[in-house]
Swiss-Prot record:
GO molecular-function terms, A-Z: 4 iron, 4 sulfur cluster binding; ATP binding; metal ion binding; oxidoreductase activity, acting on iron-sulfur proteins as donors; oxidoreductase activity, acting on the CH-CH group of donors, iron-sulfur protein as acceptor
Keywords carried by this UniProt record: 4Fe-4S, ATP-binding, Bacteriochlorophyll biosynthesis, Chlorophyll biosynthesis, Iron, Iron-sulfur, Magnesium, Metal-binding, Nucleotide-binding, Oxidoreductase, Photosynthesis
EC number(s) stated in the UniProt entry for this protein: 1.3.7.7
Residues that hold Mg(2+) according to the record: S16
Xref: NCBIfam families: DPOR_bchL
Keyword NAD: no
Provenance organism: Chlorobium luteolum (strain DSM 273 / BCRC 81028 / 2530) (Pelodictyon luteolum)
Cofactor (UniProt): [4Fe-4S] cluster
One GO term (biological process): light-independent bacteriochlorophyll biosynthetic process
Protein name in UniProt: Light-independent protochlorophyllide reductase iron-sulfur ATP-binding protein
Length: 276
């Protein structure tokens, strides 16, 4: 039985880069991993495969949406450390629903019988709007992970995600494994003070703190995971540690997790100092 993870976060905060590096850390610890990109940008698996692969929606269009005509090879690419990647894709701009495409991808995975092939299945999901389709991975996940930065917009989105996880937990097994604080700029005096407060209020923890580092950004544009960058790169070992920490935690016998209790908007403003 696969360990199923659903990674969510506000767009543009490094969610997919973080997901790819978590997948890499899990694979290097011996797990057979499938990463599924659930974002219309369809670039989640780029650091793993080194290319923009064909999406599920593109493959379905080629067979007039007859799921039974597709095989795993039509939609899956293998990349770094033997990680398999799949991209849901999205409809043309101005038409259709991105969430629907995510739901179709989940259906295809079931029909292809892929859930039993992997040790870990990681969904990398757009977290700005958690509608029915984009929340579908929570129906199958053992654990959700929220990627966030230490700012209002990110925390606001994280709170909405906590609402979705709480609601899904009533019918499904999903729990929140924690929040990954991303782009923590220690060099410029940055920290996680607001995220620390938020995590405590909703009843979760900071799973790891990923530093802001140019090497992480460069690895993304190079189409590589951080683990695939040259060992001589300055700061590589420091940057790897949070991802290895996350992988070790998730592969443990009983990772710490909880059902979050979202807070009101006023409390979020109080955390960031906007309202008293």
């Amino acid at each position: 039985m696969s360990l199923v993870l659903a990674v969510y976060g506000k767009g543009g905060i490094g969610k997919s880069t973080t997901s790819a590096n978590i997948s890499a850390a899990l694979a290097l610890k011996g797990a057979k991993v499938l990463q599924i990109g659930c974002d219309p940008k369809h670039d989640s698996t780029f650091p793993i495969t080194g290319k923009l692969q064909k999406t599920v929606i593109e493959a379905l269009e080629e067979v007039d949406f007859h799921h039974e005509e597709l095989t795993a090879e039509d939609v899956i690419e293998t990349g770094f450390a033997g990680i398999d990647g799949l991209e849901a894709g999205g409809p043309p701009a101005g038409s259709g629903c991105g969430g629907y495409v995510v739901g179709e991808s989940v259906t295809l995975l079931q029909e292809l019988g892929l859930y039993d092939k992997y040790d870990v299945i990681l969904f990398d999901v757009l977290g700005d709007v958690v509608c029915g389709g984009f929340s579908a991975p929570l129906n199958y996940a053992d654990y959700a992970i929220i990627i966030a930065t230490n700012d209002f917009d990110s925390i606001f989105a994280a709170n909405r995600l906590c609402m979705a996880i709480q609601q899904k937990s009533v019918r499904y097994k999903v729990k929140l494994a924690g929040i990954v604080a991303n782009r923590v700029d220690y060099a410029k005096g940055g920290g996680t003070n607001m995220l620390d407060q938020f995590a405590e209020k909703v009843g979760t923890r900071l799973l790891a703190k990923v530093p802001y580092h140019e090497l992480i950004r460069r690895s993304r544009f190079a189409g590589k995971t951080l683990f695939a960058m040259d060992d001589s790169e300055e700061g590589k070992e420091e940057c790897l540690q949070p991802y290895l920490q996350i992988a070790e935690d998730l592969l443990s016998e009983a990772p710490m997790s909880s059902v979050p209790v979202p807070i009101g908007d006023r409390e979020i403003f109080e955390i960031v100092g906007g309202w008293q």
